[in-house]
Amino acid sequence: VRRRVLEATKLTVGTVPLYEAAIETIRKTGSVIDMEADFLFEVIEKQAAEGIGFMAIHCGINRITLERLKRQGYRFGGLVSRGGSFLTAWMNHNKKENPLYDQLDRLIGIMKKYDVILSLGNGLRAGAVHDSTDRAQIQELIINSEVAEYAQKRGVQIIIEGTGNITIDEIESNDKKKKRMSNNAPFYM
């Protein structure tokens, strides 16, 4: 399907390669916790070589953000990001760092080689307005902002995913806060 979409349009096409890697692993073994980091990077490179223009990659979920989430406690909306859920399950079971964060130079090398825009996913976005801009989400934004700066210094274009569910009166102040924290990195909502 992806190849046919790429052939049918001149528009920039984006993917979330973690989904393909996770689903393929689940089909083979029955669980995302069996996913191999090398397989995830193979999927990323394969999609980049096919001509994907941007990829949503969840680098901001790491041991630090998961510890922040744990200390914070209950979230009304839980963890609503599919990519965030896959990575959290994988990290907790395997007691390992997120390979997308841990092997950041490898990821950036692929993005640069194929001129793919790195879209930093928000795996801890709020699933309910009650959780908007909570500590875990802010911690992920800090990590994503650091990754964005690191990638840009290495010649990779980036965008950062927006906030998730917030009340309408929080949008402007939230956007200003995120722009300030990320050194004015481009966001999309």
Can you name each region flagged by the protein language model?
Residues V1-K178, S182-M189:
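Alpha/beta enzyme core
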